[in-house]
Amino acid sequence: VESYGAELYSSALTAVNDYGRRLSLAALGEVAGGIYSAEDFLDDDGFGGEGLALRVSIEISEAGISYDFTESSDQVRGNLNCPESVAAAAAYYCHCCLLPVGAPLCAGLFKDLKILTRKPSIVNPAFPAAVAAGNVETSMRLVDLVFRALAKALPHRIPAASQGTMNNVAMGAAGANGLSWDYYETLAGGAGAGPHRPGRSAVHTHMTNTLNTPAESLEYHYPLRLTRFAIRRGSGGLGLHAGGEGLIREIEFLEEAQVSLLTERRRFAPWGLDGGGDGEVGYNWLNGEKIAAKADIFAVAGDRLLIETPGGGGWGTPPD
């Protein structure tokens, strides 16, 4: 503003937004108009609610695009409730994936995009609903849900489902030396395969973008030992293009700790597309015994927590 003045600055913003809007409408113009719907299910909310439905109907027309989530499940007792703003962010992300590379991220891209929700529901809860996992888990599944619907309109552009969870692992304790500690990480998994490529293995996808914690840093700063960190072979869905593989991460506790797990895709598998196979669901283990997708546990020295993250869905009928 100091360099060019308020008037020129304002006109430049208007020009960028107008350009973004034209790009968005042009991209939508390449899609056959109509209504495209999809359904998927969250495993559970940790309080007995299971098979929680996520549903979307996407209407595409010359006037723009709308994402209707109103048929999704009611809000739940657990923290999978997803604020409307987070649901909108998931839809915006998917919308941007339809645009040309280099499209400017601006309000104009979303000028003709509408988000429809129902309150109270799992996609627009009422206060004081718990929402922590709505941001890290439900948002991931909304992305795959939207892609599943869009695949009906754009079958040769949309990938199969990715792992669909951030595999949240949190732990901590007062500490044997009197110093409290806490540690939180999200774990990568398999990416869904697409029409032109296999899915990548052991990567973060869609709504998560964290890096893995190096073993050296983990063991230096915390009373933990990383005993296994590997690709989970065979977890990606079969297909003309195979889904990406998940990973295996095993941590040994050197002193007692409280552990919280917030994970998904332990029951409903990442789906394949166009004849591709589903990816494998994930598993959580403590000392060889399976534990729930959402769990609070107390570990003692010598205990081992092992997480197997989901693979991605395959794309296309597998070759003979």
Where do the language-model regions lie?
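Glycine/proline-enriched, intrinsically flexible loops and inter-domain linkers
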Residues: V1-D320
